Amino acid sequence: MFGRVAVLLGGTSAEREVSLLSGRNVLEVLRVRGVDAQSVDGVPALAQALVERRFDRVFNVLHGHNGGGEDGVVQGLMQAFGVPYTGSDVLGSALSMDKVRTKQVWLALGLPTPRYASLSVCATAVEVRQAVEMLGFPVIIKPAKEGSSVGVSRVFALEHLEEAVALAARYEGELLMEQLIEGDELTVSILDEMALPSIRIVPQGQWYDYNAKYLAEDTQYVCPGLDDVAEAEIARLALAAFRAVGCRGWGRVDVMRERGSGRFFLLEVNTAPGMTTHSLVPKAASQLGMGFDDLVWRILEQTL
């Protein structure tokens, strides 16, 4: 039914290790189910395989950009060769990878997202100070095109600002300085134009950083994360945010719920989310009785 399937993983982005874990999990499921599947590490290897016509479709779990699989580059490559693939197309992938442009689209459509300022990696101390004065502490500083909390800092005082900017500036592209919303962090997985139950994330540390996402064993995940009324509201918001930036197939929308007001604020969209044992899309799917194997199968079926 599927022919020869490439599981695209690894790459050279800052999220390589997570992608390798995701890809191995997906590959194991496909092989157990009798699919002729092979792993392909990175975009150059995929390009060579496509030239040689070695695969009929691609399951993309290549995370990140600049050697990753979420910035539209590899999607354009696959479309050029006429090979179907999982996840969002060129536009949805490229736009979602850029957190600044994503926020601009959401704001233009009246969708709620934290106040922000964009900065170049060469921003002067004066420009950084002006951005902070506009937003007010606390803020989050992050690379505009990275995921998995790579290069992200929470800043509560002026003396920590320079260090946070320097960390984010190690990565390619603009920096995003964003108003820090205090409250519950939630995520809504999208599968086949349907919002899965939200997950409320309860890290044991101060926040949901890289360690809490992929290494810690004590991070708690509450699913569904909200009461029925709020659950319906966040599902509508997540679907609207996903569609606004042209995404399709499957993905994940990260949201904050402000303490006190209960208001939701959109953070970002992930178009090739993790598929590790700690990953959130499999956790949400399991709440509906869908095991990891069935989830992988549903995603691959989107290429037919």
Swiss-Prot record:
InterPro entries: ATP-grasp, ATP_grasp_subdomain_1, D-Ala_lig_Van_CS, D_ala_D_ala, Dala_Dala_lig_C, Dala_Dala_lig_N, PreATP-grasp_dom_sf. It holds the Pfam family Dala_Dala_lig_N. The keyword Ligase applies. It is found in: Cytoplasm. Disulfide bonds: none annotated. Gene3D superfamilies: 3.40.50.20, ATP-grasp fold, A domain, ATP-grasp fold, B domain. It comes from the Bacteria. One of its GO terms (molecular function) is D-alanine-D-alanine ligase activity. It is an enzyme of class 6 (ligase). Its main location: cytoplasm. GO terms for biological process: cell wall organization; peptidoglycan biosynthetic process; regulation of cell shape. Mg(2+) 1 binds at residues 254, 268. ATP binds at residues 132-187. Residues 103-301 form the ATP-grasp domain. The keyword Membrane does not apply. It catalyses: 2 D-alanine + ATP = D-alanyl-D-alanine + ADP + phosphate + H(+). Its EC number is 6.3.2.4. Pathway: Cell wall biogenesis; peptidoglycan biosynthesis. Mg(2+) 2 binds at residues 268, 270. Keywords: ATP-binding, Cell shape, Cell wall biogenesis/degradation, Cytoplasm, Ligase, Magnesium, Manganese, Metal-binding, Nucleotide-binding, Peptidoglycan synthesis. Its cofactor is Mg(2+); Mn(2+). GO terms for cellular component: cytosol. PROSITE patterns: ATP_GRASP, DALA_DALA_LIGASE_1, DALA_DALA_LIGASE_2. Cell wall formation. This is D-alanine--D-alanine ligase.
